[in-house]
Amino acid sequence: VILAGDMFDGERVKIRTIDEILDAVRRTPNVDYLYLAGNHDDTAYAFADHDIPTNLKLFSKEWATYEYDGVAISGIEICEANAHSLYLNIPHKNGVVNIVTLHGQVGSSSDVDEINLSLLKNKGINYLALGHIHTYSEQPLDSEGIYCYSGCLEGRGFDECGPKGFVLLTVESGHLEHEFVPFSCRQLHRIPVDISGLTKNSEIGQKMKAAAQGIPSEDMVEFLLSGGVDPTANLAVSYLQNLVKRDFFLVKVKDQTHLAINPEDYKHDISLKGEFIRLVLDSDASEEDKAAIIRTGMQALMGEEITL
């Protein structure tokens, strides 16, 4: 099992977490775990003062290679000291499938968090196992190999949407095949919903439900409301969230709308509404706050229940 970094979120890791990981490794003594630390974790710190099982192999800031039947797996932790020099002596074993694991963002320069992809081409790498990006992706490296981010096993926020899982590598007769295997028990989805012109929460709710059709009920959904909204519209995020919260495991609703309002329409309006809107538009409040203030004020002027 190749773990290409970021198993932890930081250097400070609870002892209980470390113990559970090491216990899991010990329960499968016939499986080797090859762990390369990422930019969010520190192997030396995390496993300090712990007895490391023999089947947990830790990469360091120097190249190391672990050989198996027909496969050689090499890796190195990128740091300031080796960010440029590591490309000069990339390990390669003749007659076997060569896998290299690194952690960082692929790019065109050599840095602590950036992997210089061009310097890895034509080095006999059949598969470049990468960590850092939490979404699965794969691209050709050169004529002989590919590079691949396996992503994470479970999405941890709405910035990590889509299928999550691991990559299964199969090596037979000197040939490597790879397959993405979905693993997460649920997915996260960000659903944009343009509510321009809608003034009623019931209409907005119907459009949200239509936009989320086909998403399994066990998944998590974040609705992003956008578009221009009339100042008299009674947009109540809490109401909308309650309207759809039973449809999915978790629901969030974000108001990213803007006021569909033309200041010229209220320039000569002598009503209380006109005076109120002019005062708010001329204030130093942010556009987001102006929209919220005007919406709340309109509710108050019309004698409606104020929703915040």
Residue ranges of predicted features:
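His/Asp/Glu-rich metal-coordinating catalytic cores
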Residues: 9-148, 152-157, 161-165, 170
